[in-house]
C-alpha cells in the first residue's frame, strides 16, 4: 500500500516538473484533453458508484466501510492510470491533473479515517480541510484556464 502511494507520489512529482508547453495551441489541446478525460472519469465514477450501491446497499458498519474502501481504491487506481496516460506539458494543465489525482488519494485517506462520519477524528478533519483547499485551487485554476482556452 505504501509502495503504491510512493509510486503515485513519484509520478505526481515527475509530472509537476515537466517542461512548458510548446505553444498556446498545444496548451489549449491539452486542456481540452484533460477536460474530456476528467468528465469521462467522473461519469464512470458515478455509474460505478450506483452499481456498487445497488450490489452492496445491504452492508452496514465496518463491513460496509471496508467494502466501500476496497471498491474506492480499485476505481481510483484505474482512474489515476488513465489520467496519467495523458501527455501534458503545460504546467497549469499539469497542475489540474495533479490536483485531480490528489483529490482521489485524499478521499481514500478520508474514508480510511472515518472522514465522512458525523464526528470525524482530528486527522480526518485535517484531511477534509486539505481536500477542500485542493478543490478550491482546482476550481480557480480550471476557471482561469477555461477563460484562457475556451472549449
Label each residue range with its predicted role.
Residues 1-2, 17:
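N-terminal hydrophobic targeting signals that begin at the initiator methionine
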Residues 2-9:
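Sec-dependent signal peptide recognition
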Residues 12-15:
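C-terminal motif of bacterial Sec signal peptides marking the signal peptidase cleavage site
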Residues 17-70, 147-151:
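Immediate post-signal-peptide N-terminus of mature secreted/exported proteins
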Residues 31, 35-49, 76-79, 100, ...:
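Hydrophobic alpha-helical core bundles mediating ligand binding, dimerization, or RNAP-core interactions
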Residues 51, 58, 89-92, 96, ...:
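Soluble, cytosolic/nucleoplasmic coiled-coil alpha-helices used as oligomeric scaffolds and tethers
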Residues 68-131:
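Long, amphipathic, charge-rich alpha-helical segments that form helical bundles/coiled-coils
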Residues 134-151:
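Short, low-complexity, Pro/Ser/Thr/Gly-rich segments in the mature regions of secreted, periplasmic
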Amino acid at each position: 500500500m505504501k509502495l503504491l502511494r510512493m509510486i503515485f507520489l513519484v509520478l505526481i512529482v515527475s509530472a509537476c516538473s515537466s517542461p512548458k508547453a510548446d505553444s498556446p495551441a498545444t496548451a489549449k489541446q491539452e486542456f481540452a484533453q484533460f477536460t474530456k478525460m476528467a468528465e469521462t472519469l467522473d461519469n464512470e465514477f458515478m455509474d460505478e458508484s450506483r452499481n456498487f450501491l445497488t450490489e452492496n446497499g445491504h452492508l452496514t458498519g465496518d463491513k460496509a466501510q471496508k467494502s466501500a474502501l476496497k471498491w474506492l481504491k480499485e476505481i481510483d487506481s484505474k482512474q489515476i492510470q488513465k489520467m496519467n496516460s495523458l501527455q501534458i506539458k503545460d504546467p497549469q494543465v499539469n497542475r489540474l491533473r495533479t490536483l485531480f489525482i490528489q483529490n482521489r488519494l485524499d478521499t481514500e485517506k478520508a474514508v480510511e479515517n472515518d472522514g465522512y462520519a458525523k464526528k470525524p477524528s482530528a486527522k480526518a478533519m485535517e484531511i477534509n480541510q486539505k481536500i477542500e483547499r485542493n478543490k478550491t485551487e482546482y476550481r480557480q485554476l480550471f476557471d482561469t484556464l477555461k477563460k484562457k482556452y475556451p472549449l
